[in-house]
């Protein structure tokens, strides 16, 4: 078995070089190769990108091992959000088209997300009036602000925003994770307030991750330039750089591979030598499940690979079982993980 896995790794590494930014194409190539070689013992599970030690490979074990116990079907997340306007009215929104009208503005929702449209009234809404878009566990949503800035919001995230921007800055407030594609306006910097810190840009694409339970603010820059400013320090980021502010107030900057940090907005999970405990934090938000580790050793197992976020939860857990030599039991929306003995 080790020899067969090794040969698959070698092929996967070659494909990764050839199709570095197209894992789906690489998977199809690997699938055709395996069919020609007629390796019967292993099947390919579409959507699972797996690294075994040194290289990437699309792999799924077609085993008779039934250690994964499912008592219910776990569905992936979907487009859904709760919009709370400043007047206290609450709207539950999703893919269905709808139009919400305020005294001065319109909020249009369709399959592409939420779009803010300014009205033509003589007395526009005060720019000090902020509304709230909340994304629950198992949800995601996209919105376009009044200035044309697009925002992708991940599960368990909140964005405070005005229906219209005014003054010298375009300011929003974020909790959780979001990707911003900021409309260019040199005269009016775009500012994202996160806890006691702020990120200032003119026109750029960047990701911000700030969940209270994680104890850090991670800003990853895709294009343009941003300035991250904490209470005590500040850094300027260039494309391919990331700032991390920890709970002790320490601010650091480093160069990173950007894609794993922004792949979620394109419907993918991408992992690069990540601890299983950290992976399950992301997975639990998207699939809206609880996770319980029965031993500390399982938390430290590292994985590299990826899959589509809309793939089945069972496929993901079987992949983790196979690679990590662990047992997973799912009961009452809770995943129990233990090191295989």
Where do the PLM segments sit?
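Prokaryotic Sec-type signal peptides and long signal-anchor helices
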Residues: 9, 19, 53-56
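A residue-level detector for the "anchor" residue at the start of short, highly conserved motifs
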Residues: 30, 35, 39-44, 54-341
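N-terminal amphipathic alpha-helical interaction or autoinhibitory segments
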Residues: 1-10
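Positively biased amphipathic helices and basic secretion/translocation or surface-docking motifs
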Residues: 11-42
């Amino acid at each position: 078995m080790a020899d067969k896995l090794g040969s698959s790794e070698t092929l996967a590494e070659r494909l990764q070089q050839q199709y570095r930014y197209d894992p789906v194409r690489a998977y199809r190539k690997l699938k055709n190769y395996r069919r020609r070689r007629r390796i019967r013992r292993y099947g390919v599970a579409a959507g699972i990108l797996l690294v075994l030690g040194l290289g990437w490979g699309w792999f799924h074990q077609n085993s008779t091992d039934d250690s994964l116990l499912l008592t219910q079907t776990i569905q992936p997340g979907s487009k859904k959000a709760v919009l709370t306007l400043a007047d206290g009215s609450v709207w539950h929104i999703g893919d269905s088209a709808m139009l919400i009208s305020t005294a001065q503005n319109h909020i249009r929702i369709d399959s592409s997300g939420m779009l803010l449209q300014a009205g033509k009234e003589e007395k526009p809404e005060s720019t000090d009036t902020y509304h709230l878009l909340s994304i629950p566990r198992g949800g995601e949503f996209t919105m376009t602000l009044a200035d044309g800035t697009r925002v992708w919001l991940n599960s368990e995230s909140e964005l405070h925003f005005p229906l219209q921007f005014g003054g010298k800055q375009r300011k929003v407030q974020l909790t959780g994770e979001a990707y911003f594609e900021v409309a260019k306006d040199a005269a009016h910097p775009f500012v994202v307030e996160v806890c006691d810190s702020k990120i200032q840009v003119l026109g750029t694409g960047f990701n911000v991750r700030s969940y209270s339970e994680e104890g850090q603010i991670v800003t990853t820059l895709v294009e343009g330039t941003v300035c991250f400013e904490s209470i005590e320090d500040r850094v300027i980021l260039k494309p391919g750089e990331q700032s991390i502010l920890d709970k002790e107030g320490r601010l650091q900057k480093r160069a990173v591979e950007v894609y794993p940090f922004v792949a979620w907005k394109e419907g993918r999970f991408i992992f690069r030598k990540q601890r299983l405990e950290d992976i399950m934090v992301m997975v639990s938000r998207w699939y809206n499940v609880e996770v319980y580790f029965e031993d500390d050793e399982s938390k430290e197992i590292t994985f590299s690979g990826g899959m589509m976020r809309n793939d089945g939860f069972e496929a993901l857990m079987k992949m983790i079982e196979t690679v990590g030599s662990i047992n997973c039991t799912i009961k009452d929306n809770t995943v129990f993980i233990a090191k295989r003995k």
